[in-house]
Amino acid sequence: MKTAIIYWSSTGNTEAMAQAVAQGVESVGAEAVLLTPDQVDPAALGAYGAIAFGCPAMGSEVLEEMEFQPMFDGCKNNLCGKRVGLFGSYGWGDGQWMRDWENDCGNAGISLVAPGVICCDAPDDAALEACRALGKALAE
């Protein structure tokens, strides 16, 4: 199964998480394609059996608003029936942005394969393993 891993990262933390998700996808023999928001065509998402979205918490615990949020909003209608996962890092707060993002997905009829994977600042070994597990769950 071909899996898209779409992420936005300013410090490299969420990018490291995206790479770990890709490792998980590839560990079960599936194809992982890493994309940034500017590379995403919502109409082309049909080519993927599963999609992971990664975005850090920004500002007052919201998704990045200039590139990522508009791209994600444009993709929502193409995600019903897909295997979807979420991940991201944060530097303060308690992960509220991920709970809000999960609720947004639920309200849009998007079912997630697992709870969103989050970590504070740079991902440690446990966070990277959780990302690999998310990749496996998406691809299996």
Segments predicted by a language model, with ranges:
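FMN-binding flavodoxin-like domain, especially the glycine-rich phosphate-binding loop
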Residues: 2-3, 13-16, 20-140
